[in-house]
From Swiss-Prot:
Protein's recorded name: Elongation factor 1-alpha, somatic form
GO molecular function terms listed in the Swiss-Prot or TrEMBL record: GTP binding; GTPase activity; translation elongation factor activity
Stated family: Belongs to the TRAFAC class translation factor GTPase superfamily. Classic translation factor GTPase family. EF-Tu/EF-1A subfamily.
Taxon lineage: Eukaryota, Metazoa, Chordata, Craniata, Vertebrata
Primary gene name: eef1as
Ranges for region G1: 14-21
Sites of N,N,N-trimethylglycine modification: G2
Length: 462
């Protein structure tokens, strides 16, 4: 086997009919975790339903349907391999909770792949003022996904097919608007593809002899190639934040007979190991970690990205819950947030939002109502420049700096210190009405919380 390949996460974005599913399906189909038997089964079903033209999107439809119904599908289905990486597709839009998932995302995407359709009129629809292309790209950038690849899809349906002129026109247009958002087009690979026919997906296309390949220049090293797969190989691997203090938002807390209380969650920053004394915020409970395990194997330490369960001493299941955050009691322990200042972008709200609005915030694993206490300034959502002080209202499309107060104790962090704990989705009327990143947190001075005996003992022996 040799050394395992690095894992990277991508998010696939673009307008509803750009061909995201077909393109993603193609990659999973050709390089991924779907076994031949499943594919044959899908093909047979497709033929019976008269969807013989199914090709790849069908694969994704099947997987999506299973995901939507909450069937835990074998997650390998959303993985594929390049020569350098194991790639996981964290989410593909079209999924109901896509925006929420992208923000509270169980994991941060390392790169966004933007698919735009080159067909006559299609590109224009996707990029128009109300097309989703812009919104997705803006979201990705706001949420800290700084690497981008653009797949110019459906090259087989341009007039004439595989038109170089059309490709160049689109590259020019897309470059202009991703630049406005904040991406540097020199660092972005633009690849003309057909997710359906496979042009430039895994192998160079004989249909576009004019295409001399894509090039990117960046300080971390430049790259060039012809296919989408090669562009994925050029993604810079993430540096996992092991050197930061520990932050581990809890997803669940279990009571396991003979073992005791076992909180479960994903390490976002830092490391957790047996013997460490951890503090849970906002409940302010401090105790010793007895053991850490992942997939039923004991670990000497868990690092960012690991989903772990850890056993804690003298803490009852009633003391800690989902949405709490564990951290190292001796190294910038997490604390309750009294209030925080955030930059929010209103995505789709039918009316106006004024001070006093109190929707639910989804931030890491916490789900808590927060009040928009003060609208401080309205800003230009691309440049961040101030447009007006103390606006009375905000409406869809606006960006603003807002002071927020949690309705119940909550632990959040500024995006610059701990990115996964510093971005949130604002939910109201069963949809995501806004997204935000936290600029600053006013932490509550912790009173004397519960410190278990084992924590006191551990402190003495150190």
């Amino acid at each position: 086997m040799g050394k395992e390949k690095t894992h990277i996460n991508i998010v696939v974005i673009g307008h509803v009919d750009s061909g995201k599913s077909t393109t993603t399906g193609h990659l999973i189909y050709k390089c991924g975790g779907i076994d031949k038997r499943t594919i044959e089964k899908f093909e047979k079903e497709a033929a019976e339903m008269g969807k013989g033209s199914f090709k790849y999107a069908w694969v994704l439809d099947k997987l999506k349907a299973e995901r939507e119904r909450g069937i835990t599908i074998d997650i390998s289905l959303w993985k594929f391999e390049t020569s350098k990486y194991y790639v996981t597709i964290i989410d593909a839009p079209g999924h109901r909770d896509f925006i929420k998932n992208m923000i509270t995302g169980t994991s941060q995407a390392d790169c966004a792949v933007l698919i735009v359709a080159a067909g006559v009129g299609e590109f224009e629809a996707g990029i128009s003022k109300n097309g989703q292309t812009r919104e997705h790209a803006l979201l990705a950038y706001t949420l800290g996904v700084k690497q981008l690849i653009v797949g110019i899809n459906k090259m087989d349906s341009t007039e004439p097919p595989y038109s170089q002129k059309r490709y160049e026109e689109i590259v020019k247009e897309v470059s202009t608007y991703i630049k406005k958002i904040g991406y540097n087009p020199d660092t972005v690979a633009f690849v003309p593809i057909s997710g359906w026919n496979g042009d430039n997906m895994l192998e160079p296309s004989p249909n576009m002899p004019w295409f001399k390949g894509w090039k990117i220049t960046r300080k971390e090293g430049s790259g060039s190639g012809t296919t989408l797969l090669e562009a994925l190989d050029c993604i810079l691997p993430p540096s996992r934040p092991t050197d930061k203090p520990l932050r581990l938002p809890l997803q669940d807390v279990y009571k396991i007979g003979g073992i005791g209380t076992v909180p479960v969650g994903r390490v976002e920053t830092g490391v957790i190991k047996p013997g460490m004394v951890v503090t849970f915020a906002p409940v302010n409970v401090t105790t010793e970690v007895k053991s850490v395990e992942m997939h039923h194997e004991a670990l000497t330490e868990a690092v960012p990205g690991d989903n772990v369960g850890f056993n804690v001493k003298n803490v009852s299941v009633k003391d800690v819950r989902r949405g709490n955050v564990a951290g190292d009691s001796k190294n910038d322990p997490p604390m309750e947030a009294g209030s925080f200042t955030a930059q929010v972008i209103i995505l789709n709200h039918p009316g106006q939002i004024g001070a006093g609005y109190a929707p639910v915030l989804d931030c890491h694993t916490a789900h808590i109502a927060c009040k928009f206490a003060e609208l401080k300034e309205k800003i230009d959502r691309r440049s961040g420049k101030k447009l007006e002080d103390n606006p009375k209202f905000l409406k869809s499309g606006d960006a603003a700096i807002v002071d927020m107060i949690p309705g119940k104790p909550m632990c959040v962090e500024s995006f610059s210190d701990y990115p996964p704990l510093g971005r949130f989705a604002v939910r109201d009327m069963r949809q995501t009405v806004a997204v935000g990143v936290i600029k600053a947190v006013e932490k509550k001075a912790a009173g004397s919380g519960k410190v278990t005996k084992s924590a006191q003992k551990a402190a003495k022996t150190k």
